[in-house]
């Protein structure tokens, strides 16, 4: 899902400047994280609308009698809703993966800071 992001090809010198200003690709991680949150919100809204639609149709069926085609259609809609729930679960799994990356990054960053401080101390 995050691979759907398409970036324009930039000249090499712009890429070098960008790489120097963000060597750990934090900006890309932030964009991907925001996109993932957007997709989760979008899926939640879609599930909410589908659920409301199914409930309204069920109410109509109860009021006007049960028809086999309608039942089959509702079963199909329920299956679609379950698929959307599965997709949403995948998005949450991706969030968990991002959390793991962030935790790992924090510990690596602490190590870099410690090494840098030692380097600065040796230069004094």
Curated annotation (Swiss-Prot):
Keywords from the named record: Coiled coil, Cytoplasm, Transport
Disulfide pattern: none
Domain of life: Eukaryota
Record carries keyword Disulfide bond: no
InterPro entries named in the record: CNL1 (IPR034455)
Example GO BP: endosome organization
GO cellular component terms, semicolon-separated: BLOC-1 complex; cytoplasm
Cell compartments where the protein resides: Cytoplasm
Residue segments, region Disordered: 1-20
Cytoplasm is among the record's keywords: yes
Membrane-traversing stretches: none
Coiled-coil stretches noted in the UniProt entry, renumbered to this chain: 75-98
PANTHER family reported in the protein's UniProt record: BIOGENESIS OF LYSOSOME-RELATED ORGANELLES COMPLEX 1 SUBUNIT CNL1
Protein purpose: Component of the biogenesis of lysosome-related organelles complex-1 (BLOC-1), a complex that is involved in endosomal cargo sorting.
Complexes and interactors: Component of the biogenesis of lysosome-related organelles complex-1 (BLOC-1).
Family, as annotated: Belongs to the BLOC1S4 family.
Protein name: Biogenesis of lysosome-related organelles complex 1 subunit CNL1
Gene giving rise to this polypeptide: CLN1
């Amino acid at each position: 899902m995050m691979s759907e992001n398409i970036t324009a090809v930039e000249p090499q010198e712009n890429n070098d400047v960008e790489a120097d200003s963000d060597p750990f690709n934090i900006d890309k991680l932030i964009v991907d994280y925001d996109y993932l949150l957007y997709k989760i919100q979008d899926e939640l809204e879609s599930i909410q609308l589908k659920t409301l639609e199914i409930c309204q149709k069920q109410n109509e069926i109860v009021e006007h009698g049960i028809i086999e085609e309608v039942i089959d259609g509702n079963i199909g809609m329920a299956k679609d809703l379950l698929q959307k729930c599965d997709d949403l679960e995948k998005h949450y799994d991706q969030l968990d993966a991002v959390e793991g990356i962030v935790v790992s990054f924090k510990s690596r960053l602490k190590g870099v800071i410690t090494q840098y401080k030692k380097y600065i101390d040796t230069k004094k």
